[in-house]
């Protein structure tokens, strides 16, 4: 079941859903708006990115006020908010329609597991033929929360739990990709 604004506020007030910093006006009728943090990560260099060897050639940058995402550019960004989901709530990350109408695609693989905590790393892609300027602290995406039908056997304890700042791919840590 998708959570309403009342349920979202109730979970935050009880301390079961943690959002830091929390801005009450960002609770919408069925979602919570999250803001853009101050870090981006750019993939640089040439050649193949080998998923077994980890991410090389990633440059993490901090910005004060804004940055421009160039046409057809892909980069990682992070939310300003650090969130902590209770073990019975999952969330979907959705881009804001107003930004999508500019050609900005916002993802994070779209899913936040129950029990996750950390800042959310976002994948941004500018499909426009013009640069798009994004500002630190602007509302960038929204979380849609859903209550699980029953408690999970195990909550999220993966490689991104507790992440702060923009975090590049850690796919090389997946069990099936580890070198023998």
Curated annotation (Swiss-Prot):
GO terms for molecular function: dCTP deaminase (dUMP-forming) activity; dCTP deaminase activity; nucleotide binding. The active site is at 123 (proton donor/acceptor). The record marks 110-111 as: Important for bifunctional activity. Pathway: Pyrimidine metabolism; dUMP biosynthesis; dUMP from dCTP: step 1/1. InterPro entries: dCTP_deaminase, dUTPase-like_sf, dUTPase_trimeric. Signal peptide: none annotated. The keyword Nucleotide-binding applies. It is an enzyme of class 3 (hydrolase). SUPFAM superfamilies: dUTPase-like. It catalyses: dCTP + 2 H2O = dUMP + NH4(+) + diphosphate. Its EC number is 3.5.4.30. GO terms for biological process: dUMP biosynthetic process; dUTP biosynthetic process; nucleobase-containing small molecule interconversion. Pfam families: DCD (PF22769). Keywords: Hydrolase, Nucleotide metabolism, Nucleotide-binding. The keyword Transport does not apply. DCTP binds at residues 96-101, 113, 121-123, 142, 156, 163. Homotrimer. Bifunctional enzyme that catalyzes both the deamination of dCTP to dUTP and the hydrolysis of dUTP to dUMP without releasing the toxic dUTP intermediate. Belongs to the dCTP deaminase family. This is dCTP deaminase, dUMP-forming. It comes from Aquifex aeolicus (strain VF5). The lineage of its organism: Bacteria, Pseudomonadati, Aquificota, Aquificia, Aquificales.
